[in-house]
Amino acid sequence: MMEERKSAPVMRRVVLAAAALMLCAAALVCALLYVNATTLRGTVSRTALTLTTPDELGAAAELWSAETAHGVLKLRGALARRGIGAVDLRVGLIWKPDGGAEEDAVTLLNTQMVRVDTAGMGVQDADDHCGFVAAVKLKRLPHRGENGQYRAVLVSEGQLIDGGALGLTLRRQGESWTVEGGSR
C-alpha cells in the first residue's frame, strides 16, 4: 500500500512532463507552419514568362481582400478558368521604385489554392479549385527602406497574367506600408 502512494506522485510528474513536452512540440509545429506560410518562394524573370491577360485565357481574375496586419500581407482572390484541374498558380509582386522603372524580377509569394464558388465570376464551367490565398511577412520583401510600390500579378504555368487583373498596389514609404486598390 505504501508503494502505491509513492508511485502516484511520480506518475503525476511523468504525465505533467509529457503534457508539457506535447505543448512545446505543438507550439514549435505552429511556429514552423507560420514561418513557412509567410516565406517568399523565390523570384522569376518577367522575360522568361509569356505575358497574357485573363481575357486572353478566357478567365476572370478577382482580388477579394488585401490587408496588412501584424507585419503580414494577406491576399485572397481567384483566377476562374474553364475546366483546368490542378494549377500551379502563384501571386507575384513587381517592384517599381519612386521615379524609376519597374524591375524585371517578379517576387513570388507562398500561394495556396482553395475551393471557391465561381458562379458569379462570369466563366462557365469554371474549376472551383481556382481560389488563392497568399501571404508574406513584409520584412521579407526586398528593397527594405526604399520608397516605391509593388504591383500584384499572377504567375501560372510559365505565364505572367497581368493587364491590371488584380489592380493591387502595395506602397512603401520607408518602413510603412499602404495597400491601394484591388479588383473587388
Question: What do these predicted ranges mean?
Answer:
Residues 11-184:
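Basic, ligand-binding patches in group-transfer machinery
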